[in-house]
Amino acid sequence: MIVDSSVIIAIFLGEPDAPDLSLRLRRAPVRRMSTASLFEAGIVLDQRVGLEPNEPADELYALLQRAGIELVPFTEDHAQIARVAYRRYGKGRHPAGLNFGDCMSYALAKSLDEPLLFKGTDFSRTDIRVA
């Protein structure tokens, strides 16, 4: 299963759906996340939590480790898939309205033919398998 940044953000911030998302993560035999999605999650959490530029992101990495999430490098092939995803499902082009970060998760899920765990409804309007 591929994990979108929205899931990590929700769990990290203790949002109302965090327990359900955590359970779904634990039940998956394989959990992967793109390094591009990790970067996105880090940016969002830095903004919401208010980390200073020199503060380490240890808590985010600890969460990934506890959840058993394998980080997968974002490749040129992923970039090509993400570009096609944006053309098909991007904001202003399609009701799914995928943004830059969404396309990164989409690309990894598509390239590995794995379902995607995410928060919200955007991906359910695409051809991606839902976890």
Regions found by a protein language model. Name each.
Residues 28-32, 67-72:
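Short loop->beta-strand "edge-of-pocket" segments that line small-molecule binding or catalytic clefts
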Residues 20-23, 62-66, 86-92:
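Glycine/charged-rich beta-loop-alpha catalytic/anionic-binding loops adjacent to active sites
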Residues 1-33, 37, 48-62:
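Short, well-structured N-terminal submotif of metal-dependent ribonuclease cores
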Residues 70-115:
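Active-site neighborhoods of divalent-metal-dependent phosphate/nucleic-acid chemistry enzymes
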Residues 10-12, 44, 126:
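Residues that scaffold the ATP/ADP-binding catalytic core of kinase and kinase-like folds
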Residues 106-131:
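Acidic, PIN/NYN-like endoribonuclease modules and their adjacent C-terminal/linker elements
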